[in-house]
């Protein structure tokens, strides 16, 4: 069926090319032609979808077709076209259609928008492009959140796939580039509910002219304000989106939180299943987990700068 569809579309395109040819049609040549293709991915494997898309783009570039309209649910197709060529139709409410125009959202006269557009375009692949088709999105910083969130949801008797919720790994704190696409305060944005999960990552810097922020433990936060300046990550974002109509920022507890991995270990401090053979201090951690007394645990710790900081914080 896929090849039959291609043959049929090729015949239609050949006729359109002939109809627009002055040499062939003389004065009857059609000067304005549009091509509309619905669900071109039907029965076509990804490589053939790319090939067909390239064929259409070549026809437009050569002037055989003035404009091409294509409807698609293919992530391969979406990831292969430019952002300015996309129009995203969503239905946040039954009977209501929202139209999103990425080419309008990212303004060419704004340097920040240009940088964001370039990043999003590089980021999109056949997997990430699924964000245009999901009903709701959860943006996360890394692979741990991407893998574990669906598992945590199942423990709560929720299935993210059934709810059409997609977890998107940003590979870092690059939320701002993508939030422009979905910020409903801006016209022509794509209307979806967005959650951004980010690590609170407490940090501190010495009160010196050339001081730089460095990561610190939650129990070290604000204990030496005379010599250090402290801050948490995402304070601005959490406040900025607290009352936003479709975007929210969430992070760990201010008192105890640091990262997802840190919190998992803190809540399951005697669970050896969390340890892998690649951990450099595997024996040390297993020995500490075997103890129930804090002082005995500290006695199993190796001498290092990080462990000294931990012991000092516990003692104080």
Regions found by a protein language model. Name each.
Residues 1-127, 146:
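Switch/communication elements of ASCE P-loop NTPase nucleotide-binding domains
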Residues 91-316:
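Acidic, divalent-metal-binding catalytic cores of TOPRIM
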């Amino acid at each position: 069926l896929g090849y039959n569809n291609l043959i049929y579309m090729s015949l239609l395109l050949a006729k359109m090319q002939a109809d627009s040819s002055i040499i062939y049609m003389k004065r009857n040549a059609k000067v304005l032609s549009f091509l509309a293709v619905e669900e071109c991915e039907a029965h076509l494997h990804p490589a053939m979808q790319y090939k067909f898309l390239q064929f259409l783009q070549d026809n437009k570039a050569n002037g055989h077709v003035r404009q091409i309209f294509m409807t698609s649910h293919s992530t391969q197709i979406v990831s292969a076209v430019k952002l300015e060529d996309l129009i995203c139709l969503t239905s946040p409410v039954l009977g209501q259609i929202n139209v999103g125009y990425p080419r309008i959202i990212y303004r060419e006269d704004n340097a920040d928008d240009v940088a964001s557009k370039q990043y999003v375009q590089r980021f999109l692949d056949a997997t990430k492009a699924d964000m245009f088709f999901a009903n709701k999105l959860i943006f996360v910083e890394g692979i741990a959140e991407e893998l574990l969130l669906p598992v945590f949801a199942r423990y709560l008797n929720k299935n993210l796939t059934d709810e059409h919720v997609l977890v998107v790994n940003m590979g870092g704190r690059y939320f701002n580039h993508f939030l422009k696409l979905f910020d409903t305060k801006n016209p022509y944005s794509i209307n979806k509910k967005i959650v951004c999960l980010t690590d609170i990552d407490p940090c501190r810097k010495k009160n010196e002219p050339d001081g730089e922020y460095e990561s610190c433990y939650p129990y070290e936060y604000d204990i030496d304000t005379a010599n250090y300046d402290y801050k948490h990550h995402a304070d601005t974002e959490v406040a900025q989106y607290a009352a936003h109509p479709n975007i929210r920022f969430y992070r760990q507890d201010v008192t105890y939180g640091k990262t997802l991995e840190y919190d998992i270990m803190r809540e399951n401090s005697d669970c050896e299943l969390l340890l892998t053979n690649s951990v450099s201090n595997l024996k040390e951690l297993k020995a500490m987990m075997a103890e129930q007394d804090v002082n005995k645990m500290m006695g199993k710790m190796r001498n290092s700068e990080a462990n000294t900081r931990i012991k000092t914080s516990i003692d104080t």
